[in-house]
């Protein structure tokens, strides 16, 4: 027979680490080539001009320039697209 009360078990007590998703460079910001613009799961924001997409759907800058977001119509829903505009020296 038990001389101490047994402790109950629980199925809780775990949590995953945060993945630090989201926008890393906002509209109008200057970025360099290779810098991360958005970390995302899936393609909620589409890559535009001078923007590449990694295998985990991360968007990154292909050239130096400034960040610009635009809203586009894709099928029946509106989507966002991110572009990098490079300023040409005159």
Swiss-Prot record:
Region (Disordered): 1-24
Biological process according to GO: translation
Keyword Ribosomal protein attached: yes
Membrane-spanning segments: none
One GO CC term on file: cytosolic large ribosomal subunit
GO molecular function: structural constituent of ribosome
Keyword terms, alphabetized: Ribonucleoprotein, Ribosomal protein
PROSITE patterns: RIBOSOMAL_L27
InterPro entries on file: Ribosomal_bL27 (IPR001684), Ribosomal_bL27_CS (IPR018261)
Keyword Ribonucleoprotein included in the entry's annotation: yes
Lineage: superkingdom: Bacteria
Family label: Belongs to the bacterial ribosomal protein bL27 family.
Protein name: Large ribosomal subunit protein bL27
């Amino acid at each position: 027979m038990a001389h101490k009360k047994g402790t109950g078990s629980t199925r809780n007590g775990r949590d995953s680490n945060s993945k630090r998703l989201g926008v890393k460079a906002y509209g109008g910001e200057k970025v360099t080539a290779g810098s991360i613009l958005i970390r995302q799961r899936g393609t909620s924001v589409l890559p535009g001009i001078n923007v590449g997409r990694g295998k985990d759907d991360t968007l990154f800058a292909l050239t130096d320039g400034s960040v610009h977001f635009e809203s586009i119509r894709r099928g029946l829903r509106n989507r966002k697209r991110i572009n990098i505009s490079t300023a040409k020296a005159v």
